């Protein structure tokens, strides 16, 4: 982080607030895409009126002080007033517990956001991840447009963002599986926020590799979504375990089933999914890679989110 980089950040954020997304949710600045030299450690999100600034590496003391000054100036700017922003939260992702501090506005522990007209509840200031990964915005929209009348399996469901999009898109039924039951509980809350019929949604709080019987029982599925963490201690190691899922897909899918397979590790490119699918489930053919939101531009397109569509 340099003085020149901070000036770039200031100008970018003032412009972003001038053209704020209103009640919607968007990333305002994506330094981690490495398109902004000196700002690789910072991102800024607009969460339906809350500005979330995330630091992924500790800057030098003088630059950290300058960043605080910049953010204070931002909250007193005409652009801030114009945007109607309600608060600013700085999260130190590099520190133990992802320590957070409110620099403006009334502290909020929970906050409702909107994405493509759908509502989600976030945790602010208490957890490393707030509850919705914004880079998957277009993936959720694709699911919403794909699933009318279909049965969906959502693996590694987290807070059920895909499920909310699927039910909004007219899916017949969605089965969500995640070993984190608290995340699934939040998923229920997200469906309720959108006044969805919960009789069409199933929540399985189980470890996937011990639960194939339960997963098969609720199938077959027209769409299987696989969006695992890069590493989940004690339960999932991406490169070793992803293949185990892929080889099971043919027994889970309907005759013309579709798979949305995702990976979000900078060290793993799309060829990993394409080659692994060809080896483990050759019946499934690669169709396309979904676009990522333009605000998540990355200097290396193989480093950012990969969301690939396969069909029988």
Language-model segments: residues:
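Conserved SAM-binding motif I beta-strand of class I
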Residues: 173-178
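Conserved class I S-adenosyl-L-methionine
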Residues: 149-158
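C-terminal catalytic and target-recognition region of SAM-dependent MTase-like enzymes
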Residues: 258-312
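Conserved SAM-binding loop of SAM-dependent methyltransferases across substrates and taxa
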Residues: 159-171
